[in-house]
Amino acid sequence: MKKLFAEFFGTYWLVFGGCGSAVFAAGYPTLGIGFAGVALAFGLTVLTMAYAVGHISGGHFNPAVSFGLWAGGRFSAKD
């Protein structure tokens, strides 16, 4: 359950920080956030979650990655 919560929180933070910055940049183009700012926001959200909960769950933060590893036999469903 601890791993599940860590992955859920990491995915939430990635969507909130990364996608939120993209929405913010599109909504206020005069601020000049641009592509580099959005890319930096995505990178920093992954970095913060990797340090915060990566040691607990492995830090996939993307259900597609977990599913792909499970389908390839490199990740058990109970993990």
Curated annotation (Swiss-Prot):
Keywords assigned: Cell membrane, Membrane, Transmembrane, Transmembrane helix, Transport
Database matches in PROSITE patterns: MIP
Catalytic activity reported: H2O(in) = H2O(out)
Protein origin, superkingdom: Bacteria
GO terms for MF: channel activity
Record site feature (Selectivity filter), residues: 42
Site residues, Involved in tetramerization or stability of the tetramer: 19
GO CC annotation terms, alphabetical: plasma membrane
Signal peptide start and end residues: none
Motif (NPA 1): 62-64
SUPFAM superfamilies for this protein: Aquaporin-like (SSF81338)
Subcellular compartments: Cell membrane
Residues that span the membrane, as ranges: 4-24, 33-53
Record has ATP-binding as a keyword: no
Membrane topology recorded in Swiss-Prot or TrEMBL: Multi-pass membrane protein
Pfam families: MIP
Keyword flag Cell membrane: yes
Quaternary structure and interacting proteins, as annotated: Homotetramer.
Family, per entry: Belongs to the MIP/aquaporin (TC 1.A.8) family.
Free-text function comment from the UniProt entry: Channel that permits osmotically driven movement of water in both directions. It is involved in the osmoregulation and in the maintenance of cell turgor during volume expansion in rapidly growing cells. It mediates rapid entry or exit of water in response to abrupt changes in osmolarity.
Protein name in UniProt: Aquaporin Z
Organism: Flavobacterium johnsoniae
